[in-house]
Amino acid sequence: MSLIRLNIDSFRNIQLAQLSPSEGINLIYGQNGSGKTSILEAIYFLGMGRSFRSHLSQRVINNDQDKLTLFATLNLPRGDSKIGLRRFRSGETEVKIDGEKVKRLSTLAETLPIQVITPESFSLLFEGPKSRRQFIDWGAFHTDPQFYAAWMNVRRVLKQRNQMLRNGSPYDQIQYWDREFIRYTEQVTEIRNRYVDSLNELLKGIIGEFLPQVDVKVSFTRGWDSKTDFAQLLESQYPRDLATGHTVSGPHKADLRLRVGTLPAQDALSRGQLKLLVCALRIAQGKLLKQQIDKHSIYLVDDLPSELDAQHRQLLLKQLVDTGAQVFVTAIEPAAIVDSLHTPPSRMFHVEHGRVTVIE
């Protein structure tokens, strides 16, 4: 799967751009503020319905316009597919796939699986467990068709349970919701655990190339003590849940733990090593997607030269090329990427003041 055509209209400082990317490495270069990262952001927005840089979607709309429009043609095994997204300053969103209106943004994500390696994506290890849960759930969503419905049911029941706790409801009234909560939690936890086990098999080899002297152990924690029955835990923790007004333990507290010896990876590794570990996680996730459902991710790699030294840039780009996936990578100077590749980029684009030019 790859993007073979991309139209961007009124997205940040890009008023209008048309790109015909290659299936391989696409190098986008230009000075800071030129709009090169906005191209990556537009691709991400088209696949996720939101930005990886700002949670306020209205900010990505060009200041002089009341809406943005993104359109792409995808090359898929079954043939070409067209996807389009329009976001209004009012917050309304219109999505179409092959001319048909789509109501759920999750359909976009399913159609266009995207992996991001940016300065912001390194928060996967530096921040709390939420980003690591999202990492697990990205993979579970794309590789198991039952995950999305189960997780949406967990969220629905958890919201109802927390509301009852805030209302001071007695436990006999909450028990009905607990039965639902337990059922869907078992489904979500099983899928997550199975996914992390599969990821681990691929991850060991990739980490070995990035960090050959480091033994990183990766494990899944489900959000409560693995030795404790979840039904018994919910009942015994009811007084605490009631006091706090929310459910303290459960699948919404799950985490992906990475350790070196007895220490969390965040404490044992340097910042540079942690960046390489995040790159390994992203590459393993893309490879697993291809292995399990025969579908490539699209990789968006922003500002690589500022994040990794020349040796590790070369290693990362080699790994990305080996995935066979389509890659979009940005840099201020093209030489920083070109010199790190064994063969020239498949296509190069220069961006200046929001204008995109293909370099022949």
Swiss-Prot record:
Compartments in which it is found: Cytoplasm
Gene Ontology terms describing biological process: DNA replication; DNA synthesis involved in DNA repair; double-strand break repair; SOS response
UniProt-annotated binding residues for ATP: G30, Q31, N32, G33, S34, G35, K36, T37
SUPFAM superfamilies xref list: P-loop containing nucleoside triphosphate hydrolases
UniProt keyword terms in alphabetical order: ATP-binding, Cytoplasm, DNA damage, DNA repair, DNA replication, DNA-binding, Nucleotide-binding, SOS response
One function term, GO molecular function aspect: single-stranded DNA binding
InterPro entries in UniProt: DNA-binding_RecF, DNA-binding_RecF_CS, P-loop_NTPase, RecF/RecN/SMC_N, RecF_2
Protein task: The RecF protein is involved in DNA metabolism; it is required for DNA replication and normal SOS inducibility. RecF binds preferentially to single-stranded, linear DNA. It also seems to bind ATP.
Name listed for the protein in its UniProt record: DNA replication and repair protein RecF
Species: Shewanella oneidensis (strain ATCC 700550 / JCM 31522 / CIP 106686 / LMG 19005 / NCIMB 14063 / MR-1)
Phylogenetic lineage: Bacteria, Pseudomonadati, Pseudomonadota, Gammaproteobacteria, Alteromonadales
